[in-house]
């Protein structure tokens, strides 16, 4: 069994008995092989995956003898790799072409990959392309290239992240009143699905921050303060800034009685607000 493009080990006949005056071979050797005086050598240039039976004849003045041998020529094993071997993709974004690089003259007859690629990605003759539709943590895949010379493999790793989130708060400058329930403040969210939310520093007493939503009734006054809000997912983080001011309650006053009649040069009683 030989390999295309690889020099074979020279085959010499073992001759006993009389001197051979003439040699013959049938059928003719494959392209790249030479048969001279019973010696077979060379570098096969074509594949022959089905064995061919050759008959070699040795002729002497006393007669002819023959010997048969079978020759198979396989394709060189295909050696390849992927550069890069690690890909970090984003759900919903196109991967145009991720193809192998090979290092020898072998040519693959078939390809396979294990396990199956995530939804949206396509594996075609060793090339990976498409638009992933699901998220995936880092996962290893084995790619196989097969031909008559055997199989070779390469490992690759694929991570698929959620698209980075985008968000906005409107209004972003809140003026609240102590002991007065605020209007719920919800962010406008686009991009990927948000996994976690954060806010710094802690919001004023009486307010709550849940899944990006600020609500509640502030219990104490405070000067204008800036807060940083993060929206996070596997694709990254988005930052927004808001300001919160908490004012004191507007006082309410009244006088009883509403009307007072005074006398000139006469001391009045204190008239105090209620």
Report the location of each language-model feature.
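A short beta-strand segment in extracellular, disulfide-stabilized domains
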Residues: 7-15, 94-102, 181-189, 267-274
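Short, solvent-exposed loop/linker segments at the N-terminal edge
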Residues: 1-7, 88-94, 174-181, 260-267
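C-terminal edge beta-strand
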Residues: 63-74, 150-161, 236-247, 259
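Proline-enriched interdomain boundary motifs that mark the N-terminal boundary
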Residues: 1, 76-84, 163-171, 249-257
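Exposed beta-strand face motif in extracellular beta-rich ectodomains
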Residues: 50-54, 137-141, 223-227
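Low-complexity "stalk/linker" and mucin-like segments enriched in Ser/Thr/Pro/Ala/Gly
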Residues: 24-39, 113-126, 198-213
């Amino acid at each position: 069994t030989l390999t295309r493009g690889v020099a074979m080990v020279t085959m010499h006949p073992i001759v006993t008995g009389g001197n051979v005056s003439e040699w013959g071979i049938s059928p003719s050797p494959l392209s790249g092989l030479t048969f001279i005086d019973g010696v077979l050598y060379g570098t096969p240039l074509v594949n022959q995956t089905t064995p061919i039976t050759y008959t070699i004849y040795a002729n002497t003045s006393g007669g002819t003898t023959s010997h048969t041998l079978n020759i198979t020529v396989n394709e060189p094993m295909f050696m390849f790799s992927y550069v890069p071997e690690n890909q970090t993709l984003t759900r919903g974004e196109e991967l145009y072409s991720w193809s192998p690089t090979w290092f020898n003259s072998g040519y693959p007859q078939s390809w396979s990959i294990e396990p199956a690629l995530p939804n949206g990605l396509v594996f075609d003759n060793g090339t990976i392309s498409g638009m992933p539709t699901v998220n995936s943590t880092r996962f290893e895949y084995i790619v196989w290239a097969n031909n008559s010379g055997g199989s070779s493999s390469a490992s690759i790793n694929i991570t698929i992240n959620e698209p980075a989130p985008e968000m906005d708060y409107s209004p972003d400058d809140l003026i609240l009143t102590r002991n007065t329930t605020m209007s719920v403040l919800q962010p406008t969210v686009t991009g990927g699905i948000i996994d976690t939310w954060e806010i710094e520093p802690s919001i004023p007493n009486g307010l709550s921050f849940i899944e990006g939503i600020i609500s509640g009734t502030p219990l104490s006054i405070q000067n204008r303060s800036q807060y940083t809000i993060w929206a996070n997912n596997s694709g990254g983080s988005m930052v927004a800034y808001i300001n919160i001011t908490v004012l004191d309650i507007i006082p309410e006053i009244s006088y009883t009685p509403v009307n007072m009649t005074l006398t000139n040069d006469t001391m009045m009683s204190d008239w105090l607000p209620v």
